[in-house]
């Protein structure tokens, strides 16, 4: 598993270093995960923080802004 700093760096690169946009995407995805959505990455919800799961999903390109806009 990569360090969270590396994952956060990759996630920021995915959103063109827009921290505000990243925060909004993470908030929306964490809300989905807390309501029972399945993680799009191989991470156990019981072992990892929802923030870490959402950040990893963004870093790996599993979550796009267009998906969040549909909420």
From Swiss-Prot:
What UniProt keywords are attached to this protein's entry? DNA-directed RNA polymerase, Nucleotidyltransferase, Transcription, Transferase
Q: Which GO terms describe its molecular function?
A: DNA binding; DNA-directed RNA polymerase activity
Which reaction is catalysed here? RNA(n) + a ribonucleoside 5'-triphosphate = RNA(n+1) + diphosphate
Q: Which InterPro entries match?
A: DNA-dir_RNA_pol_omega (IPR003716), Pol_omega/Rpo6/RPB6 (IPR006110), RPB6/omega-like_sf (IPR036161)
Pfam families reported for this sequence: RNA_pol_Rpb6
One record GO biological process: DNA-templated transcription
One GO CC term of this entry? Answer: DNA-directed RNA polymerase complex
EC numbers listed for it are 2.7.7.6
Query: At the top level of its lineage, which domain of life is listed?
Result: Bacteria
SMART domains according to UniProt? RNA_pol_Rpb6 (SM01409)
Question: Function of this protein?
Answer: Promotes RNA polymerase assembly. Latches the N- and C-terminal regions of the beta' subunit thereby facilitating its interaction with the beta and alpha subunits.
Cited NCBIfam families: PRK00392.6-2
The protein's assembly and partners: The RNAP catalytic core consists of 2 alpha, 1 beta/beta' and 1 omega subunit. When a sigma factor is associated with the core the holoenzyme is formed, which can initiate transcription.
The family assignment reads:
Belongs to the RNA polymerase subunit omega family.
What name does this protein carry? DNA-directed RNA polymerase subunit omega
Species name: Wolinella succinogenes (strain ATCC 29543 / DSM 1740 / CCUG 13145 / JCM 31913 / LMG 7466 / NCTC 11488 / FDC 602W)
Organism lineage reads as: Bacteria, Pseudomonadati, Campylobacterota, Epsilonproteobacteria, Campylobacterales
